[in-house]
Regions:
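Conserved beta-strand-loop-beta-strand element in the redox core of flavoprotein oxidoreductases
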Residues: 156-176
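Conserved FAD-binding catalytic core of PHBH/FMO-like flavoproteins
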Residues: 136, 181, 185-299
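Conserved mid-domain beta->alpha element of the FAD-binding
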Residues: 16-25, 134, 184, 293-380
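Beta1/beta-strand and adjacent pyrophosphate-binding region of the FAD-binding site
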Residues: 4-20
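A conserved short coil-to-beta-strand element within the FAD-binding core of flavoproteins
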Residues: 148-163, 298
Length: 442
């Protein structure tokens, strides 16, 4: 593309290409709504990020014809999706909540033998594998154009339209966009939300023994992990000790993991090198083990936040721009996908003259309530595991240590059942009182 300024018109412009933005582009593309999507990143997610696709989201993917493709991605079909707890990965196993591998999940769900009865089972897959599928599907619609490597520098909301300016990374190309609606899908630090003056309300970085305050994420490759630590594979691996609490999700079932640990007060994340990141992992293992660090960064756990507003006249926010979770229960990414499904058909109907302003307003009414509900559940899960503190001598090879480990394992497995077996939470959101629902007598 030649250097210069290009003026483009679109019914909808989406700022951000994560799960919410890409899913919304698909929902609009299915309804032939002209849509431009821009994201400052050069492509879809590299780091693992979200690691669980709930059953409702899998049902949406089934409707789009991609459920089987998604289920074939990520970990091998026979890889255990257990939740396992250890003092350290190479030391004592405290307990394990067994869950079916993806090859057995749907058959089990459809047998009506367990707690899940649905057309699709949950699937343990990293967001990094889901996003490319969503991008490809969105780009298949003639009415949708996806642009990665473009940063929004400004936007202005008018009475009947919204304008926005995007600059391409490392070029002199600018797009001046005129759209009927602008969607803020630009994540936790949303420029769109901030310019609208909307506030995130709730708990910021709530401190806990684990899953509260500063955490550190390490994306690593360690194919010999289970051989070295001498344990059976699991999807989610937790350590429970007073020195290096951590969780680690299997990413591909072949040796890539997403490792997260609570930083101690004496640890300065600014000084963490690749080698120190590897040491954090080794401390959680409790044995000497080699690994390749692919990336590492700090993040804050303990958020339970929902924006006070989701919509203005011509600008709408969703996904992480509208709500922030501590990633317990796998609710954040899945809530974002549901935001997109809810908003997509409503935007299309209004743009086609089949609905009025009230239909758009129902998006805020419905999805804000669900966000408050879901962040509350996630906070409860984080409290349950994060405020459960290891007893002294838990790691001791003594009779007392064995008793302490038995009690801890019992508690943690019961916690896992509450956090990772949640059909009621997955399917139980309600839109009572929504303006699009017929009123009934109390």
């Amino acid at each position: 593309m030649a250097k210069g300024v290009y003026i483009l018109d679109s019914e909808v412009v989406i700022v951000g290409g994560g799960p919410f933005g890409l899913m919304l582009a698909i929902e609009l593309g299915r309804r032939n709504v002209t849509t431009l999507l821009y994201d400052a990143k050069n492509g879809t997610a590299y780091n693992p990020q979200a690691n669980a696709t709930q059953a409702r989201t899998m049902e949406y993917f089934r409707r789009l014809g991609i459920a089987d493709e998604i289920r074939a991605l990520g970990m091998p079909a026979n890889y255990p999706t257990d939740i396992a707890y250890f003092t350290r990965y190479g030391h004592h196993e405290l307990g394990r909540f067994e869950l079916p591998a993806s090859s057995k999940a749907n058959a089990l769900v459809r047998s009506n033998q367990g707690s899940w009865t649905a057309s699709e089972a949950p699937h343990r897959i990293s967001q990094k594998f889901v996003e490319p599928v969503l991008r490809r599907l969105a780009e298949a619609y003639d009415s949708v154009t996806i642009n990665f490597g473009w940063r929004m520098t400004e936007f202005k909301e008018g009475a009947s339209s919204v304008s926005a300016v995007f600059e391409q990374s490392e070029t002199d190309v600018t797009h001046n966009i005129n759209a009927t609606y602008l969607i803020g899908a630009d994540g936790a630090r949303s420029m769109v939300r901030k310019q609208l003056g909307y506030s995130l309300l709730g708990e910021y970085g709530e401190e806990r023994h684990f899953f509260g305050g500063r955490m550190y994420a390490v994306y690593l490759r360690c194919p010999e992990f289970y051989e070295v630590v001498g344990k059976q594979p699991a999807w989610m691996n937790w350590t429970f000790n007073d020195n290096r609490r951590a969780l680690m999700a299997a990413v591909d079932g072949k040796g890539e993991f997403a490792f997260h640990t609570q930083l101690r007060s004496d640890e300065d994340e600014a000084t963490i090198t690749d080698e120190r990141a590897a040491d954090l992992f080794r401390e959680a293992c409790g044995v000497n083990i080699d690994c390749e660090v692919l990336s590492h960064m700090g993040w804050t756990a303990g958020h339970s936040l929902v924006a006070d507003h989701f919509i203005s006249d011509r600008v709408i926010i969703g996904g992480d721009a509208a709500h922030l979770f501590t990633p317990a229960g796998g609710l954040g990414y899945n809530t974002a996908v549901e935001d997109a499904v809810n908003l997509g058909w409503k935007l299309a109907a209004v743009l086609k003259g089949q609905g009025g302003r009230g239909l758009i307003e129902s998006y805020e009414f419905e999805r804000q309530k669900v966000a408050l509900r879901n962040t509350g559940y996630a906070r409860g899960f984080a409290d349950s595991v994060g405020n459960f503190v290891p007893e002294d001598n838990l790691e001791a090879n003594t009779e007392n240590g064995e008793l302490l480990r038995s009690a801890a394992g019992e508690y943690l497995v019961e916690h896992a059942k509450r956090e990772f077996n949640i059909p009621g939470i997955t399917f139980g959101a309600r839109y009572d009182g929504s303006p699009v629902l017929p009123k009934t007598d109390e």
